[in-house]
A protein has these predicted regions:
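Basic/aromatic-rich interaction segments and small domains that mediate binding to polyanionic partners
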Residues: 3-65
Length: 65
């Protein structure tokens, strides 16, 4: 379980064949939702702002040590 303001790695396609699709992006937890889902903000200046905020499943997140 992740906490609000915790930094994580977000991987949209963790089981993809391509390394580029499996590569994670740094994100911060904004909110904890029901059904093991989280609202995150992706720290990627190359992404348009409208795509940086997402609701994702916990299995797409990994903690940053």
């Amino acid at each position: 379980m992740y906490r609000i303001d915790q930094w994580v790695t977000y991987c949209q396609f963790p089981d993809a064949q391509s390394e580029n699709l499996r590569k994670g992006k740094r994100a911060v937890i904004l909110d904890r939702l029901s059904n093991n889902r989280y609202e995150i903000y992706i720290d990627d200046p190359e992404m348009d702002d409208k795509w940086r905020r997402k609701i994702v499943n916990a299995e797409n997140l990994k903690p940053i040590d």
